[in-house]
Amino acid sequence: MRAILLGPQRRPTLDAVVRPLFPSGPAGPFATVTAGWQEREPDDGELSALLGGRVVKLELYRRWLDVQERDPEYATAERALQEMLAELQDLYLLRLDYALRAVYALQRRAGTDRLGGTLTERVASPVAEAVAAVRELDAAHLGHVNEVRGEFFARLQPHDRPVIASHRASVADILGGASALVVAGGHVGVLADVLHLFNVAAALQSTALPFMTGRSPVIAWSAGAMALADRIVLFHDRSPHGPGHPEVYGSGLSITRDVVLLPHARARLRLDDTLRMAVFAQRFAPARCVLLEAGTRLEFSGDGGFPSGTRVLAEDGHVTSPAAA
């Protein structure tokens, strides 16, 4: 499936990206997702203008609110699910903090150790082992999250619930006539939840939809791009409360695989701290940690290759290109 990922759109580039994709104009409207804006979902006038006014809104947040109102059994169960996931995340973060403190302590030891032997013999192996322990923790947490979500959907059977089934059919019908799907940013957790609930990935993969021709793309930026990945990682080194540990949040739509997407990387990450960035990259290898900065345009076709101009965190902690990494 063709995915075009953009940098943040505070200074929009969307119109310039879309124009050459459809030189004769799109055959159908652009299906848009602004659910990440939550209550501001309808405030999409600028987005519509950038797309030439040819938009049809999926209104996934409004649909989710409708499910909350008209299917109280599902709404109650979903609230319980969110409480369980929040508890899982808290326990994971507690363990992650101790695990990463050990990694960073071993890194510092590498710079001060006066004992004999090579650096590799004395320090590199313990650091690698400590990073491996963090990787195991990340993988176990993602597995637990997916297991809990899977059990929830198996028990609640959304496809058999009339309100949800009706919305899913409506979303699939809209996508069937769209020239492209455009996913804006916002709250990545909300985006991922509603994209899963209304079965957007399955609709995109349907052979009845034009997206399978390879000509019609999914276009996304910021949190919208993160929600397309197989693994969503939250990160912020410059929060008011001090640097936070990059944390695995859950699974996205898996339209893009083996990438960890990092919008606003320069603003949110201490890219000059190569030791910290090295741990970041090593934690998620062989997936590439891809920077999505203002002006970025990356096109993924599902062949496993990386577009020209991709900027990634290398395992030595430097920002580079895949060819050089």
Where do the language-model regions lie?
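C-terminal and late-domain segments of enzyme folds
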Residues: M1-R122, P126, I232-L234, R238-A325
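Short, flexible loop segments at the rims of nucleotide/cofactor-binding pockets, characterized by
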Residues: P8-R10, Q157-P162, L191-H196, R238
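Short amphipathic alpha-helical segments and helix-helix/interface helices
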Residues: V18-R19, V171-A172, A201-L209, M277-A281
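Long, low-complexity, polar/charged, intrinsically disordered or flexibly structured peripheral segments
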Residues: R109-P162
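Short, charged beta->alpha transition segments
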Residues: S166-I174
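Class I SAM-dependent methyltransferase SAM-binding "motif I" and its flanking Rossmann-like core
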Residues: I174, A184-H187, A192-L271
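An anion/phosphate-binding loop that grips the pyrophosphate of nucleotide cofactors and donors
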Residues: A178
